[in-house]
From Swiss-Prot:
Stored PROSITE patterns: PROTEASOME_ALPHA_2 (PS51475)
Regulation: The formation of the proteasomal ATPase ARC-20S proteasome complex, likely via the docking of the C-termini of ARC into the intersubunit pockets in the alpha-rings, may trigger opening of the gate for substrate entry. Interconversion between the open-gate and close-gate conformations leads to a dynamic regulation of the 20S proteasome proteolysis activity.
CDD domains for this protein: proteasome_protease_HslV (cd01906)
Superkingdom classification of source: Bacteria
Name the UniProt record assigns to this protein: Proteasome subunit alpha
Gene3D superfamilies: Glutamine Phosphoribosylpyrophosphate, subunit 1, domain 1
Family: Belongs to the peptidase T1A family.
Single Gene Ontology BP annotation: modification-dependent protein catabolic process
Cytoplasm in keyword set: yes
Stated role: Component of the proteasome core, a large protease complex with broad specificity involved in protein degradation.
Chain spans, region Disordered: 190-255
Amino acid sequence: MTMPLYASPEQLMRERSELARKGIARGRSVVVLKYRGGVLFVAENPSPTLHKVSEIYDRIGFAAVGRYSEFESLRRGGIRHVDLQGYMYDRRDVNARALANVYAQTLSTIFTEQLKPFEVEICVAEVGNNSSEDELYRLTYDGSIVMDEPKFVVMGGQTDAINAKLRETYSDDMELATALAVAVEALRAPSTSGASGNGETEPSKLEVAILDRERPGRKFRRITGAELESLMPAEDERTGSSGGSDKSSGDGEQN
């Protein structure tokens, strides 16, 4: 009689982590950063129909990389959760911190109890009444909440090069156009440094949205078309070392 194969719990966790990390690394990058007027989302995304950046609630936005079907189920679940909380209590009681904790618990349960972990990394952002109240939460595949950089979040492909570029170029209280140029330049960093990044930063391949502090009511707004073109860095800047633009998300499976 053949003996069943045995794998230690430590080995299972390592293999699940490796699977999730590889899936996330294949995804196109997303940058989320604070600027003077709120929070800016810039995602590499050539698909006009599948979104990596979305609204969750009045002041809360969502961005993700990895397997689309998995982070889309998280997005929908998050919307249902905050809608219920706002209905039962008060819309002002809904906040990004509580939602991030719910996502952390969900991802942790999936990672430890299911055969396959979610190949996703997500960011939950909330715009406050002033810049000091803006919040960014990055959640990894195992439910860990990472807040190593309070001013910006990078997810997906070549995060090291993009993070390094943002540390060089990011500054507080940037205007929207400046913040967009900084994000685009950072997304181009892997290709300019010789790393195998996608480097797709033309306006048609970027998904750009903001949480606009001054907007009445719901703060989330997408930036597309002529408005995006007018905010983009000049063409000579995009083709030079400081290049950049945003792009849209959604390669079907791995985003």
